[in-house]
């Protein structure tokens, strides 16, 4: 970041914040390469993603040389004019992927610089992980049971690709970079569908994930500007204010350029935003708005959101996309869980002298359930079982070594079990464990051309059991039975805050 900031400081007077020349710098592609390695899909090894050869230094140098020779073709290119386009012709997938990844790194620079300056001005401790998943779970535990209404909101999608370009104009004041952005948007014509609320970030193509991730975040950044009035002084990873729930790449700079716009148009409705009982949380394309207020207040918020998105951002949002429900009678799907607030009724007997009383009490309890049908559907899509949940062998892994097969199955199970350990009922996790364990056994038996029974008898079922429950054994060592009985780990809800994203298999609806 210091190198990028220095570059902009040196050339600020003569280039007017031009970011386009950075495409000709080799370290940009090195940064994109490092990000690709750190953000790989959790159940695939690095070599399967193609990063080892595609992002090598030699290929980056060849790409830069070719761009120097055909600089004008990068911007004025037409997707249909393949004869004039040698840049995207023979190595279209390779070079286009590298340029899009490098371009995503470059357009993030203005956001990053504003983030650093904001952190320095406010003297807030820097954190490498300011993502909503770290604060949403404590919010669910501490606050949700005290609220009355919740609204399910789907982030609207732009009706035209040019809106995405116009959104970035206030951040990127570089005409060549904006033209290049238009080129990528039209080259990947399916990007419009990737921004739709029904699509998730995890469904983005592996080759251009960072590019579309940046576009998605910038789009949602604008959509969430309506909630800027909910913010109080910035908090640092606390679940008591709206600021901690925003899943932003650049966290503390939200209000700098967004506060002025809505005030001019919605002065009469500013009182709506000062309700201290409003809570907003979002992950990817889905968000919730919860309140302790009345149903009328939620209806006013619904009307405001629809009009704000339609008339200010030209985003089509149908009113029926925002559902208002009572928490005590409704469960909502969010962050890979079905969440609800239930009333636990109990009777307390009280005795005073010779008189006794029966007191009916009700306690609100927050419950989370892992969705078994979507999880089995995800496992079936990945060929671990059929649609009925019956385990099958993973034939494409049969050529791998035994240790590699065990490691892959073990990693998938630990990731799913790790994340869904917050479920109130563990029977669903036992079902997932059974599917993956038997699928692993069938895969190994197929490799050795034997039956599952024969293979398990030779290998020993305890080895598979020990491998797939390694995390539970670690917990039993950390918490002795005298102070934290091991059986409670199967009954207690545990949130692991070191998870920075929902795994692909845990994120399908």
From Swiss-Prot:
Keyword rRNA-binding: no
Single GO BP term: mRNA processing
Domain of life where this protein originates: Eukaryota
Cellular localization per UniProt: Plastid, Chloroplast
InterPro entries named in the record: Domain_X, Maturase_MatK, Maturase_MatK_N
Signal peptide limits: none
Gene Ontology CC annotations of this record: chloroplast
Molecular function GO labels: RNA binding
Predominant place of localization: plastid
Record's keyword terms, sorted: Chloroplast, mRNA processing, Plastid, RNA-binding, tRNA processing
Pfam families, alphabetized: Intron_maturas2, MatK_N
Family: Belongs to the intron maturase 2 family. MatK subfamily.
Free-text function comment from the UniProt entry: Usually encoded in the trnK tRNA gene intron. Probably assists in splicing its own and other chloroplast group II introns.
Entry protein name: Maturase K
Source organism: Galbulimima belgraveana
Lineage, highest ranks first: Eukaryota, Viridiplantae, Streptophyta, Embryophyta, Tracheophyta
